[in-house]
């Protein structure tokens, strides 16, 4: 009998989940996928998708617990309820593990209390993650629950990369350092590269580029992260869909003094109203492309700023690593935006990087990892589809089976 893992990602107004076979091929569809969204709004939405059927519910959803319980009930009606499956674990994505959690952990009451202590580090994400964990534990009491942290992969950062140049006692008191995010994705795709190159993992230097609505880059040496663009929070680094990425911190002081902006207003500005959306009015790359084709100058400038930031970090990481064997594009934009890949890698022949336009463009129908660099390119460029849910399922299974 196939053993399954329930993987949950609980957000502020939604819950996404999948039921997966942790031993399945990376390109296999999940056994069950579901979403609970618009929690707390007048009209909610729950959708459950199996290999053969789909069910939807548009009634109001008062809370996360109500939504998850209703979703499990719908799964039961489809014959794939949690009680019908041999669930070996429930894996929970948790955005911030701070310095406390540097690897997946089996969840108990003490772990939940420790997670609550980390809320100041991720006030936008961790409360919803914790809510999802508590609701799932209440509904699935006899299933081992495992937390997998976005930050864990970056616990290997050297001290000179992890620390900020601010007063040490303040940094220590408030746990201020570079934690990094998207770690599950960076770890997953980077683990595929040694086989693509035919080299031992410990000999591979690579730059991984997770480009979605949120975006981050990582420098990885011998399978361990040595630098990454996101920092204390997911706001730092690359230009993103709605986040500014790196800016001069003095901008915030200027807005506070000259414009009377509050901390909460600045938070909203930089996290939700900046990036591509702030500059061009849209954060979807397909819409941005349409605006550019229509001659929108703001959209073109937003795109140029995005590419400039991306190339700046790629160049920086090449120097930090002392040369690279591979550059990897992943996530929604990284996997699908042909022009972003082309422009990010343009005119780098002097650094041993050369894109094959045909390979870059003619990727429709190709499943799995693929090379988009030329045969003569000494630095290989790959597109590697990420699968964070499968990675979480495998890590949760491994830990649960050790108990």
UniProtKB/Swiss-Prot annotation:
It comes from the Bacteria. The keyword Acyltransferase does not apply. Mg(2+) binds at residues 9, 388. The active site is at 150 (proton donor/acceptor). Its cofactor is Mg(2+); Mn(2+). GO terms for biological process: acetate metabolic process; acetyl-CoA biosynthetic process. Keywords: ATP-binding, Cytoplasm, Kinase, Magnesium, Metal-binding, Nucleotide-binding, Transferase. The record marks 182, 243 as: Transition state stabilizer. Pathway: Metabolic intermediate biosynthesis; acetyl-CoA biosynthesis; acetyl-CoA from acetate: step 1/2. ATP binds at residues 16, 210-214, 284-286, 332-336. Its EC number is 2.7.2.1. InterPro entries: Ac/propionate_kinase, Aliphatic_acid_kin_short-chain, Aliphatic_acid_kinase_CS, ATPase_NBD. Mg(2+). Can also accept Mn(2+). Substrate binds at residue 93. GO terms for cellular component: cytoplasm. It catalyses: acetate + ATP = acetyl phosphate + ADP. The keyword Ribonucleoprotein does not apply. It is an enzyme of class 2 (transferase). It is found in: Cytoplasm. NCBIfam families: ackA. Homodimer. Catalyzes the formation of acetyl phosphate from acetate and ATP. Can also catalyze the reverse reaction. Belongs to the acetokinase family. This is Acetate kinase.
């Amino acid at each position: 009998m196939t053993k399954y893992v329930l993987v949950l990602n609980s957000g502020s107004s939604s819950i996404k989940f999948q039921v997966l076979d942790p031993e399945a091929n990376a390109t296999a569809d999940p056994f069950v996928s579901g979403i609970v969204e618009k929690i707390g709004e007048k009209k909610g939405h729950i959708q459950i998708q199996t290999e053969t059927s789909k069910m939807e519910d548009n009634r109001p959803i008062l809370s996360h617990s109500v939504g998850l319980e209703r979703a499990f009930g719908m799964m039961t009606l489809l014959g794939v309820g949690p009680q019908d499956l041999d669930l070996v674990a429930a894996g929970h994505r948790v955005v911030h593990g701070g310095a406390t959690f540097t690897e997946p952990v089996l969840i108990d009451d003490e772990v939940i209390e420790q997670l609550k202590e980390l809320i100041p580090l991720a006030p936008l994400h961790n409360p919803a993650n914790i809510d999802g964990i508590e609701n799932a534990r209440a509904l699935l009491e006899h299933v081992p629950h495992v937390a997998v942290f976005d930050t864990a992969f970056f616990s290997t950062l050297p001290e000179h990369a992890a620390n900020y140049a601010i007063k040490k006692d303040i940094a220590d008191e408030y746990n201020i350092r570079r934690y990094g995010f998207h770690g599950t994705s960076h770890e997953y795709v980077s683990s595929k590269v040694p086989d693509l190159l035919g080299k031992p993992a410990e000999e591979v230097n690579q730059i991984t580029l997770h480009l979605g609505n949120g975006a981050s880059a990582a420098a990885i040496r011998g399978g361990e992260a040595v630098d990454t663009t996101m920092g204390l929070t997911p706001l730092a680094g690359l230009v993103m869909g709605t986040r500014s990425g790196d800016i001069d911190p003095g901008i915030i002081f200027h807005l506070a003094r000259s414009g009377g902006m509050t901390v909460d207003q600045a938070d909203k500005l930089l996290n939700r109203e900046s990036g591509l959306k702030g500059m061009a009015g849209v954060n979807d790359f397909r819409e941005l492309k349409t605006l550019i084709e229509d001659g929108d100058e703001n959209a073109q400038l937003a795109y140029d700023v995005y590419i400039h930031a991306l190339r700046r970090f790629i160049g920086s990481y090449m120097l930090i690593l002392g040369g690279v064997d591979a550059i990897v594009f992943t996530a929604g934009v990284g996997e699908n935006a042909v022009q972003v890949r082309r422009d990010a890698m343009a005119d780098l022949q002097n650094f041993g990087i050369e894109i094959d336009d045909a390979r870059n463009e003619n990727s429709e129908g190709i499943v799995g990892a693929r090379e988009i660099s030329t045969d003569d390119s000494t630095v290989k460029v790959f597109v590697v589809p990420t699968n964070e849910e499968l990675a979480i399922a495998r890590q949760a299974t491994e830990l649960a089976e050790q108990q």
